[in-house]
């Protein structure tokens, strides 16, 4: 037995981070300002492995690329019908399909962050072909993913703001499966010369309008969470004039005169890359509220076990003793519930534990993020959390019981209208008070880029400089946004 233990320990000791978590490690390696040569080499091998994983998968693409437009329109029509059925069921009183609570929705936002924060990355390598009309459509898609340089339209900027406004920025500890899609997209970004058909195919799949996007947008708004990042994709991915149409055009424009069948086979393989790793529905389906609360408190216990005094005893132990071993967290929660510190399935305001977290003199103020507080709140509230259904259960007397928490939370759009009404009389003098043309520390980076661009000897050199600043790691920065605006003007 001892020999086996030593052998296992020795083997684990020599495993590299890439071997343990290949997708996560590659993801962050490729998000460096200038990815190292070994990271780029690993990216190519990683794509080969992921493409091999798609070979047994069935594909719904037509065998002939000439049938793609009909396929796309039929798919869009089916999604539309399913969404209308969803809306009808909700109107009839059905609960939300995806998010049982606000914490569930925030769990989802956090879980898909590695993918959303590299939105559009797979097309980056095609920018090098800006003067080749065969690639006009995918380059236009990339520019639109970047908001054409406008921060309020740049998809990564929007998602960063969405995470920050909901206390969900701490996502880098997610499991390796959560990084697969992001790693694929970044690997494609730096290997366009070797995987062009696969990029075209991946783009075709990614830009189709999925049912989950429509439902997600609807339910986020219902829960008071800004759905704009998702509704923006609903509009730009349309099959009429949007990214879905451009993605289809990209297939036809890139199709070679010879070896069309071989090219299209690779397009189909790239299309299937969309099916790998954790996706929207799998992340949503993996939510376990109680387990998330247990994991959260176990993580906090690593510091918490040192900072609590010993005068408060729960279940015969002080708090530090409970927190000394993360495995004791489930029993600790049971003890707090048994002694009245936590009152499940009641308004959390009735629980002493919750008042320690949130209140006028909350002793644990600042310990938990907004997302973590929402997890604890919804777990304590239990059956009182509103699922969106008109009636969710019967009480002991057989009468309908309606969830009351929150008390029919305002949708995000309703909150937005209230804020706009409050601000109508308030003038914004910031722009008028600013000195026009004055460079300060906030815009020095953008000013430096303009100077570098002015020194470039040719248009080609200028475009190359801009492309460097439009990488997945840079495009959402101040200089990256400026580079995108300038590139967009020159390209169009």
What kind of region is each of these model predictions?
Residues 2-492:
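Non-heme di-metal
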